[in-house]
């Protein structure tokens, strides 16, 4: 009885201790001289400011933000709860964004600690629970999430994650129904913080469930846990259905996956932080010691969490990546992001281990606390007490962002490959004299994400005419370039200057690190464009980068286009195209060629015939061939070509040559045989080429190959589309945009969204919205409202029915 009273006293005392600790952490961060740190921090601060100002104007759920990415749905693709929490913090801070950040940090520290105190009480281990509460915020991986990654959404979920794991543990232990709503609700809150992270939590819990079944065999209880998570997702349907349409789901995350695996020793080495800083994820040597100790000496009830923690740790290694990358959905297995989930399970199992002697409990607690010490410097920083306003203003000046804001009339493109993290985009659009931007943070939410990727890729390749021309297409009257990128990619400042001048931009400012270009325009404007050629297929953008006068088509499928649409171009390129009906596609090409349109087909990516399983089109068959280190000499109609060697990493070159050309314009010799790779079929307006020359040219800029590619089409790499800047009047209302134009077929330079609807004709090309002459009123409506509401309603009904059935049983 006395022990129970002490536990209750502790339960009421610890929140005061945690509050004092949170206030101390806030003071340390404020005086650190480096806050707000973290690459993505200012993205979350920006979203909070966006919601805060929208609510002040009477809009409680703003659908659209015009400042980033040519217009973006800021609450659609990233979970909304962190934005509203940050907005609430900003309200408490009297409108200060920096104050909001400090309150957010303090809140995560305080609430994250409190939940562990209650969990300790639930396991009848109040003192250990109170200690873990103090420790949780300071766990190295949690500190890195806040102060290095700046992933405030995931940090917010650290409040709900332990409660969810606790509910899972308790339900599997005693199958009491009261833990089911707790599981559903806390999982729902975790998903509202970060949907992707909720998916990772679900995977980790399924791993835990498999281990639990092997140890104890209670399959039905584990199934109940899985159902609870599914219901959590369903209840979120009103937001989640819209979130899963486009945006994040349209991006390929397979390359990102590889970045979330590392060497095992790096993950557990406690001294790595002292020698290399915090560039790597840290699981914790102390946590590993607790795992091993728990597996060897613990009992079944607590051992499951320790085993699961070890499995997750092993799954973070590069060796595991070799296996995991072949699994379905593997692009979302960012295993190093699972560390905090594993730590939560380990600490929960530590709490459950009630038979462990007190001296050993104390030893493990000391070890866990000692392991956090090197990471505490992330909170303390330089402790120089330099004002955050001073630092931000100085950074704005040193990067020429303040100069760019002064001259920009419509939109700014910051070409720095996000070297400043989200801070750069925040400095452009939410600090000083804010202006709209083509770039931003949280690119997964941008409908113009492919445009942005293409700009960065073209800049790296030195295709500067494409860069400046497409910046004009995106409505950027100012372009700010990080100079070090030129050296990084072995590009020339002279070429950059020449390209900017050709498009119409002039250099207006530069310092040692940045150079600012600007073009004179009206205050608000659009673009009327005319392209001489169109490229269709997955490789279309490569052609456009090499020849900026070529427009990139929206669809790769040739059957999606009519003769009337394509006959207005002088040339049509097919590179990586697809079709549904081969005969119809061939007939379209023939009809275009007879009308005088030149059709250039890059044969390497001709679709495979469904019946013959061979690559053939218009009677020409592609035969595979492999070169090593370089091409052989090529005899062409412009003379003999001696291409450069293949670049490093591409020394084995798999490609095709052609059989069935009517007129041969290019051959090479292989093993004594003359093989065709370039010529015409049916008539001189249908040109085919093999050997994957376009890709080779994109890698090497080989002059002779470039001349050959130009000869095929007659287009020069110096040629630009015909563009005319025209004035527009753009007015924003509550979930409404009104555009007034004096011209037809005007690119508004605003990103097109599926939430747009209008009685006037609005169209989408290259992810941008086009309008015609007159006034166009565009309404914005919540996307997929009824579908999402039905999913949420179904979740509520299923949960109620399920609970009733289980209660009766």
Q: Which residues make up each language-model segment?
A:
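Membrane-embedded transmembrane-helix bundle of lipid-linked glycan/lipid transferases
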Residues: 1-387, 399, 478-481, 492, ...
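Active-site-proximal, structured, solvent-exposed surfaces of multi-pass membrane proteins
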Residues: 2-3, 537-539, 718-809
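Structural motif
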Residues: 135, 413, 480, 570-576, ...
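Extracytoplasmic/secreted cell-surface and envelope-processing proteins
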Residues: 145-146, 200-201, 243, 421-424, ...
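Extracytoplasmic/lumenal acceptor-recognition loop(s) of multi-pass membrane glycoenzymes
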Residues: 187, 370-383, 404-477, 485, ...
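Catalytic cores of secreted or luminal carbohydrate-active enzymes
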Residues: 472, 487-488, 493-499, 513-518, ...
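A glycine-rich, often tryptophan-bearing local segment used as a flexible ligand/cofactor-contacting loop or short
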Residues: 583-642
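Catalytic beta-strand/loop cores that center a nucleophilic Ser/Cys/Thr
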Residues: 628-682, 697
């Amino acid at each position: 009885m006395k022990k129970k009273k002490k536990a209750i006293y502790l339960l009421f005392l610890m929140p005061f201790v945690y509050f004092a600790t949170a206030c101390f952490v806030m003071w340390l961060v404020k005086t650190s001289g480096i806050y707000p740190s973290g690459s993505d921090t200012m993205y979350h601060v920006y979203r909070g400011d966006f919601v805060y100002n929208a609510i002040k104007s009477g809009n409680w759920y703003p659908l659209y933000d015009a400042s980033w990415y040519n217009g973006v749905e800021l609450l659609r693709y990233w979970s909304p709860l962190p934005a509203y929490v940050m907005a609430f913090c900003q309200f408490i801070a009297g409108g200060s964004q920096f104050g909001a950040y400090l309150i957010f940090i303090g809140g995560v520290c305080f609430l994250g600690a409190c939940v562990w105190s209650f969990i300790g009480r639930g396991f009848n281990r109040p003192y250990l629970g109170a200690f873990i509460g103090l420790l949780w915020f300071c766990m190295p991986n949690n500190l890195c999430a806040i102060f290095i990654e700046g992933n405030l959404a995931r940090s917010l979920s650290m409040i709900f994650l332990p409660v969810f794991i606790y509910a899972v543990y308790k339900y599997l232990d005693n199958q009491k129904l009261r833990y089911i709503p707790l599981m559903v609700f806390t999982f729902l809150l975790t998903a509202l913080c970060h949907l992707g992270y909720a998916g990772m939590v679900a995977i980790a819990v399924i791993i835990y469930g498999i281990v639990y079944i092997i140890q104890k065999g209670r399959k039905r209880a584990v199934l109940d846990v899985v159902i609870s998570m599914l219901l959590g997702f369903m209840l979120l349907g009103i937001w989640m259905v819209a979130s899963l349409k486009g945006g994040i789901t349209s991006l390929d995350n397979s390359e990102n996956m590889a970045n979330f695996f590392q060497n095992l020793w790096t993950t557990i080495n406690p001294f790595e932080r002292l020698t290399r800083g915090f560039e790597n994820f840290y699981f914790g040597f102390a946590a590993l010691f607790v795992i091993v100790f728990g597996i060897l000496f613990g009992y079944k009830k607590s051992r499951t969490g320790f085993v699961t923690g070890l499995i997750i740790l092993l799954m973070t290694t590069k060796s595991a990546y070799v296996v995991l990358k072949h699994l379905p959905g593997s692009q979302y297995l960012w295993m190093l992001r699972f560390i905090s989930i594993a730590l939560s399970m380990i600490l929960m199992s530590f709490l459950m281990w009630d038979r462990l002697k007190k001296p050993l409990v104390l030893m493990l607690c000391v070890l866990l606390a000692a392991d956090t010490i090197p990471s505490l410097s992330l909170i303390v920083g330089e402790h120089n007490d330099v004002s955050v306003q001073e630092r931000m203003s100085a950074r704005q000046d040193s990067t020429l962002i303040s100069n760019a804001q002064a001259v920009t009339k419509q939109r700014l493109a910051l070409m720095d490959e996000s070297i400043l993290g989200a801070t750069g985009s925040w400095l452009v659009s939410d600090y000083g004299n804010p202006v709209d931007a083509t770039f931003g943070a949280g690119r997964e939410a941008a409908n113009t994400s492919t445009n942005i990727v293409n700009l960065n890729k073209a800049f790296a390749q030195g295709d500067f005419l494409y860069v400046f021309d497409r910046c004009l297409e995106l409505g950027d009257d100012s372009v700010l370039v990080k100079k070090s990128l030129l050296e990084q990619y072995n590009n020339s400042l002279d070429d950059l200057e020449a390209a900017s001048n050709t498009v119409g931009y002039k250099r207006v400012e530069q310092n040692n690190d940045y150079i600012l270009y600007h073009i004179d325009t009206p205050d608000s404007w659009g673009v009327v464009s005319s392209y001489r050629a169109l490229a269709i297929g997955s490789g279309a953008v490569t052609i456009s980068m090499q020849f900026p006068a070529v427009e990139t088509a929206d669809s790769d499928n040739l059957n999606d286009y009519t003769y009337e649409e394509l006959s207005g171009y002088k040339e049509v390129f097919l590179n990586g195209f697809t079709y549904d009906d081969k005969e119809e596609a061939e007939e379209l090409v023939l009809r275009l060629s007879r009308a005088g349109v030149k059709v250039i087909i890059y044969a390497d990516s001709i679709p495979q015939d469904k019946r013959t399983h061979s690559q053939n089109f218009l009677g020409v068959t592609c035969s595979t061939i492999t070169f090593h280190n370089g091409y052989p000499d090529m005899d062409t109609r412009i003379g003999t070509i001696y291409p450069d060697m293949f670049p490093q990493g591409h020394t084995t070159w798999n490609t095709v040559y052609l059989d069935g050309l009517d007129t041969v314009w290019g051959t090479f010799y292989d093993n004594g045989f003359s093989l065709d790779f370039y010529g015409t079929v049916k008539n001189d307006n249908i040109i085919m080429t093999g050997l994957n020359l376009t890709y080779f040219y994109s890698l090497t800029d080989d002059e002779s190959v470039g001349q050959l590619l130009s000869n095929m089409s007659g287009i020069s790499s110096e040629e630009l589309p015909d563009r005319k800047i025209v004035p527009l009047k753009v007015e924003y209302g509550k979930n409404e945009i009104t555009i007034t134009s004096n011209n037809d077929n005007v690119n508004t330079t605003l990103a097109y969204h599926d939430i747009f609807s209008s009685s006037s004709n609005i169209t989408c090309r290259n992810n941008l919205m086009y309008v015609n002459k007159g006034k166009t009123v565009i309404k914005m409506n919540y996307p997929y409202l009824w579908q999402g509401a039905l999913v949420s309603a179904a979740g509520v009904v299923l949960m109620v029915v399920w609970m009733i059935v289980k209660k009766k049983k």
